[in-house]
């Protein structure tokens, strides 16, 4: 299972989905799916944009878990 920590990252910075969408240029729906951890596919460009926006490595956004 791959976990996405977007909701935690946004919460720590008090950001709304609309803020991230506006600032990154990503579609609101893409961010919502990642935020709710319901995305089944994600474009690598979206991951790249989010990592650049939050200034974090991929491992802080996404985490692989055996459970």
Protein language model annotation of sequence segments:
Residues 18, 29, 59:
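Key DNA-contact positions within bacterial/archaeal DNA-binding proteins
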Residues 8, 33, 52, 62-67:
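Short, charged recognition helix plus adjacent turn
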Residues 10, 21, 51:
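The alpha-helix within a helix-turn-helix
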Residues 26-41:
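Recognition helix of helix-turn-helix/homeodomain-like DNA-binding domains
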């Amino acid at each position: 299972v791959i976990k996405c920590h977007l909701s935690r990252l946004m919460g720590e910075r008090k950001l709304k989905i609309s803020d991230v969408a506006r600032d990154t240029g990503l579609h609101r729906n893409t961010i919502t799916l990642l935020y709710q951890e319901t995305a089944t596919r994600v474009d690598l460009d979206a991951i790249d944009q989010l990592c650049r926006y939050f200034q974090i490595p991929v491992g802080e956004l996404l985490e692989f878990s055996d459970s």
